[in-house]
């Protein structure tokens, strides 16, 4: 089998039924290849019983042609006119021979117009028009549409063959070799009995040469026909981008209206070749066809090559068009520009309100910018206060405005605005969790900077900046989550009153939003814990860098301590209900008992304490190591604890809001072995004295207390002992934090379940 036969079998999946593979001569193979390529490039379908036919009216009992009239690819402008005249003469001779001698083939007449080449084959009473329109060369010329019914043709309809669906074609044959073989074979000019394939081929060939000649004269833009399309196919097939035929055209006869199919082929250098699904436009006159094609070409740019090929098949069926790759087939009204679905760039093709995908360029932008571009409803921007907490530490617009929106208002829209916002928040939190591990300043100590003191000084400012940013982020996350839980419990209590008045749709939405809020709260807690781990790691690095200079590190340790003070001095904006206050007090007592059992000091909560401070204190304790009052008591070099000086000043000013048992005296060296004294052994006078102690002692005692006596003891044994204590307390702190977090989750989930069950029981009673 020759190379052309192999190429033909690759390009055509229906060679057995059409009889193409019965003759293996080179000219026959190229003849069929030309017919296949021309029709396939235009995306046309043939006049057959199904929609997958791509060759017009070819029966199995018909003889295959062996003659080839003219070369297929003639690029020169000077040589193209002579074969055109020869083609006209040969077409007339073929028509005469067919009328005189052959009764077995359908009639095929070819007529040349200045801007249009048409071939009309009529098997029996069926009509097929294969039209290639060259649009803006002669816009004033009219195109004749010939429909000649042949009374001489006796081809049975049962002889029309059905073809399988097209698949992706790879045309890898060199264009130069094809042209050379075509010109060699055209010189032989062997004559044989013509067939409908031969006549269609002759018409398409003349149209190709005319289009090629006239398209070379274009300056600004180019219209690709089947010859140019074959070249582009060859180029892109070499690179590995096959040109795909999206789908064959439908096959329902809409008479007398012609349906013009528009296939948009995007060819851009270095990118994948794409064929859009065909769009169909109802046409009445050829003048409109030319004007519309001209308008479609004016929208094309210089960098991309657009091939718009208009075909007027006699049989169209609109129902089968959505089977193509992108099933968007649009009907254009009379006189409108045909709508070819253009391929938008990847950022534009994604939905702007997508909740499950994020644009690739957004990973480099701050998280606060992500949320402002997505809001489509007049609801507060909640994710600005959650994920990008460094934008506003205390601004939580969502917390205040969420309670003012009843759920019944949101149930009018199927995807409610609040649900969209909650899903967006959840999505942003998860993205920030992923980005947090990729943040270069949070990946732990720099091994190269550890041995050299010259590099320590250069790394230190970066660590400090990152440390401060993480403090603000974690503090804002903690505050927002606290307020979110306040409002959530308040709303649950309010909903119990109106739950029986809600419809089923509103109740379903309430439950869905409740689940979303739970997910947001859990993700926020995970993010907060990860931030806390980064803070601990950075604080350890800063302590290691600043260890030779204890007095300089007092400012840094004070900065660490201000984190706890700020957290505890910012109460929740709303009063928490009685059950929540009892829950937080119970949780605080549990934490104090756990601290005593592990050998650490806990803290006391007086009964007269306000609910805001209890709630913020307990939630910050459960989710982070550094933000609770009990951690201000750990003075043995724990990295999460801070200097005594800065936290104590707000505590003196807010004695009514917050009290804690502090085991400190002004003289730090005398407290070597008494760090883990239980709070029961201390009186309230000692607490007050300890609160005022840093003001009296000055920076030296702050440094000694904050560092847990590491710089104050020069002996090597004391240093080793303190390092062991640090490691032991860090392990204890991690165990305690995990236990407290589990207990807190169980308590909160139990409370929410109790409220939900009471809500359901109230609704049942109301129904009865």
Curated annotation (Swiss-Prot):
Region Disordered, annotated ranges: 1-24, 39-78, 98-124, 315-338, 605-647, 663-718
PTM-bearing positions, type Phosphoserine: 153, 177, 246, 248, 255, 268, 276, 312, 378, 411, 549, 564, 569, 572, 627, 643, 670
Record field: compositional bias (Acidic residues): 682-694
Biased composition (Polar residues): 39-57, 102-122, 610-627, 667-677
Residue numbers carrying Phosphothreonine: 665, 677
InterPro entries named in the record: SSFA2_C, TESPA1-like
Sequence position, cross-link Glycyl lysine isopeptide (Lys-Gly) (interchain with G-Cter in SUMO2): 317
Keywords of this entry: Coiled coil, Cytoplasm, Isopeptide bond, Phosphoprotein, Ubl conjugation
Coiled-coil zones: 468-546
Composition bias, Basic and acidic residues: 316-334
GO terms for cellular component: cytoplasm
Designated name of the protein: Protein ITPRID2
Organism the protein comes from: Pongo abelii
């Amino acid at each position: 089998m020759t190379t052309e036969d192999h190429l033909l079998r690759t390009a055509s999946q229906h060679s057995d039924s059409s009889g193409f593979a019965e003759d293996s001569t080179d000219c026959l193979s190229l003849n069929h290849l030309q017919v296949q390529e021309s029709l396939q490039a235009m995306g046309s379908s043939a006049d057959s019983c199904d929609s997958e036919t791509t060759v017009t009216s070819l029966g199995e009992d018909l003889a295959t042609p062996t003659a080839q009239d003219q070369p297929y690819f003639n690029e020169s402008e000077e040589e193209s006119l002579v074969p055109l005249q020869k083609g006209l003469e040969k077409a007339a001779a073929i028509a005469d021979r067919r009328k005189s001698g052959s009764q077995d083939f359908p009639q095929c007449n070819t007529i040349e117009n200045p801007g249009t080449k048409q071939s009309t084959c009529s098997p029996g009473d069926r009509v097929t028009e294969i039209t290639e329109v060259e649009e803006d060369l002669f816009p004033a010329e009219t195109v004749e549409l010939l429909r000649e019914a042949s009374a001489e043709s006796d081809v049975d309809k049962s002889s029309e063959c059905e073809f399988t669906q097209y698949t992706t074609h790879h045309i890898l044959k060199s264009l130069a070799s094809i042209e050379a073989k075509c010109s060699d074979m055209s010189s032989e000019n062997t004559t044989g009995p013509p067939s409908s394939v031969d006549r269609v081929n002759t018409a398409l060939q003349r149209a190709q040469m005319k289009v090629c000649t006239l398209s070379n004269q274009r300056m600004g833009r180019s219209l690709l026909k089947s010859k140019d399309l074959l070249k582009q196919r060859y180029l892109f097939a070499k690179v590995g981008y096959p040109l795909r035929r999206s789908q064959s055209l439908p096959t329902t006869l809409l008479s007398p209206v012609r349906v013009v199919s528009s296939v948009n082929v995007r060819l851009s250098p270095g990118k994948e070749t794409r064929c859009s699904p065909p769009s169909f436009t109802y046409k009445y006159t050829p003048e409109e066809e030319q004007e519309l094609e001209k308008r479609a070409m004016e929208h094309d740019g210089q960098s991309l090559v657009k091939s718009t090929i208009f075909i007027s098949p006699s049989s169209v069926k609109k129902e089968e068009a959505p089977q193509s790759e992108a099933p968007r087939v649009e009907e254009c009204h009379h006189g409108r520009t045909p709508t070819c679905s253009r391929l938008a760039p990847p950022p534009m093709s994604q939905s702007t309100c997508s909740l499950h995908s994020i644009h690739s360029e957004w990973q480099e932008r701050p998280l606060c910018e992500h949320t402002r571009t997505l809001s489509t409803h007049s609801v507060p921007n909640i994710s600005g206060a959650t994920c990008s907490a460094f934008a506003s530490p205390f601004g939580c617009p969502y917390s205040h405005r969420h309670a003012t929106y009843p759920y019944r208002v949101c149930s009018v829209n199927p995807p409610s605005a609040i649900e969209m916002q909650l899903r967006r928040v959840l999505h942003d939190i998860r993205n920030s969790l992923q980005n947090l591990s990729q943040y270069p300043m949070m990946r732990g100590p720099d091994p190269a900077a550890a041995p050299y003191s010259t590099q320590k000084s250069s790394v230190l400012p970066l660590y400090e900046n990152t440390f401060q940013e993480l403090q603000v982020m974690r503090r804002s996350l903690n505050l927002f989550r606290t307020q979110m839980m306040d409002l959530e419990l308040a709303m649950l209590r309010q909903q119990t009153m109106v739950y029986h008045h809600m419809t089923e749709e509103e109740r379903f939405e309430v439950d869905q939003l409740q689940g979303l809020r739970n997910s947001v709260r859990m993700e926020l807690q995970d993010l907060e814990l990860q931030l806390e781990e980064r803070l601990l790691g950075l604080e350890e690095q800063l302590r290691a860098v600043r260890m030779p200079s204890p007095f300089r590190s007092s400012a840094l340790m004070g900065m660490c301590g201000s984190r706890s003070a700020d957290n505890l001095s910012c109460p929740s904006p709303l009063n928490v209900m009685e059950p929540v206050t009892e829950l937080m007090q119970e949780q605080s007592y549990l934490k104090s008992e756990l601290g005593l059992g592990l050998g650490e000091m806990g803290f006391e909560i007086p009964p007269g304490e306000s609910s805001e401070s209890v709630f913020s204190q307990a939630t910050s304790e459960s989710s982070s190591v550094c933000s609770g009052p009990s951690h201000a008591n750990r003075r043995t070099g724990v990295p999460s604890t801070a200097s005594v000086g800065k936290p104590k000043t707000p505590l003196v000013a807010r004695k009514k809001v917050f009290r804690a048992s502090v085991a400190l005296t002004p003289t730090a060296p005398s407290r070597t072995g008494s760090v883990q004294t239980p709070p029961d052994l201390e009186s309230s006078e000692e607490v007050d004295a300890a609160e005022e102690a840093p003001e009296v002692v000055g920076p030296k005692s702050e440094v000694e207390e904050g560092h847990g006596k590491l710089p104050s003891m020069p002996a090597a044994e004391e240093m080793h002992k303190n390092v062991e204590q640090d490691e032991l307390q860090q392990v204890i702190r991690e165990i305690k934090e995990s236990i407290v977090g589990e207990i807190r989750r169980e308590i909160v989930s139990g409370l929410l379940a109790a409220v939900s069950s009471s809500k359901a029981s109230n609704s049942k009673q109301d129904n009865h």
